[in-house]
């Protein structure tokens, strides 16, 4: 049953949504008490109840007629403030592990010089000029008292407590002692993609390119990563390096490579994201910004298992560097060419459902393609994009009228059937709730803005076992939010056949 307005508040209080109640209670009651003595009538009216109601009103449900979906409200107390004067940059990756811990993988080098003003001189650039650990000029040393970049990998519990932090330029000594080129470990130039598998191994990658300036080479540790990001790294949960797939420093794609990496592993290029199947221990890789394929490897050894492109085709046709297989989605859309035979950069996610279907975010083509996981990866031709061939099941356009970049990330609801598909639309700043059976939009939440419950480029979405949704943002937003689920546990009924149609 769906409730709205003051009914939402009543539902919350009846259901005792503890996380929000705790976040809003003590502070607002103390504030109200203090206000009665300082003469501020506005604060006199700020009570636990109406503070909660104000939060609820920020994310009203927008259900489709005939459809049912979970509703969400942002948790203003998640995560808790970071220690050590730390600050995070853009969120390149985010995942929830099997223990309901939330892992955030951020980009310290996305922080501006003033954001990371507490960093002093850490080395010299090629011109002998003093710079900070993330490459900003420091001719006079430290700029200010706030702040310093947190380590790139942050682990939180559901209450928002920070449990672990390691890796990257925000972790002094890590790049010199724990992720060393001599061991085959090159920390990414630009953090992108994290997953924690059923054995608690942490997988990360990156999409930095020296040729395009996203690896500037200015950092004191720049020799650690060489050329463009072209590795997938596997760590233990404490940050101990285990395995590398691919070799670092590639400068062009090869979407049909099977063994060009170190130790006989295949060669990825500018990887976006990945997931591991706990039943088969296959690592499914969205490969990605440079290559245009889904790559399959053994998660224990990194050895090649299979790969495929759009519509399940193997070999993959065309490369992102070939003008005949590129260009702008918007131009093709205007010409009515809405079924490209290739993934268009970036191929941004690969997520596996419990019932054996692989959902792939073809962000460059504003669509999600669906495959039967057991039927892909082998040589197969499907130039017409026929369902039932090469493991291809179907595809779902996501706001196809948008210039580019809608299908950025997706996750499944926590009900046993995983009946909802949550798709984060980067460009329209929205998360769609989609009935996975009908592929119709039954609700949406978010919307553009910088405030609580709003998004600017929701880059990654993930879900915990209670159905709460976590979203990380990029493009200067440098934000991660938790949305508490209430109401329905899953999606059902009919909705909008056109997912992402512009609506007020």
Question: What do these predicted ranges mean?
Answer:
Residues 42-76:
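Blade/loop signatures of beta-propeller domains
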Residues 86-97, 148-151, 171-201, 251-282, ...:
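Beta-rich, blade/repeat-based domains predominating
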Residues 357-371, 394-443:
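Loop/turn-rich, solvent-exposed surfaces of beta-rich toroidal or solenoidal domains
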Residues 108-110, 208-209, 289, 364, ...:
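Residue-level signature of beta-propeller blades and closely related beta-rich strand-turn architectures
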Residues 150-154, 230-233, 293-295, 367-369, ...:
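A short loop-to-beta-strand structural motif that recurs across blades of beta-propeller domains
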Residues 101-103, 201-203, 282-286, 357-360, ...:
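Conserved beta-propeller blade signature
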Residues 82, 91, 109-199, 449:
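Blade-loop segments of beta-propeller domains
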Residues 456-504:
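Blade-level signature of beta-propeller repeat domains, shared across WD40, Kelch, NHL, RCC1
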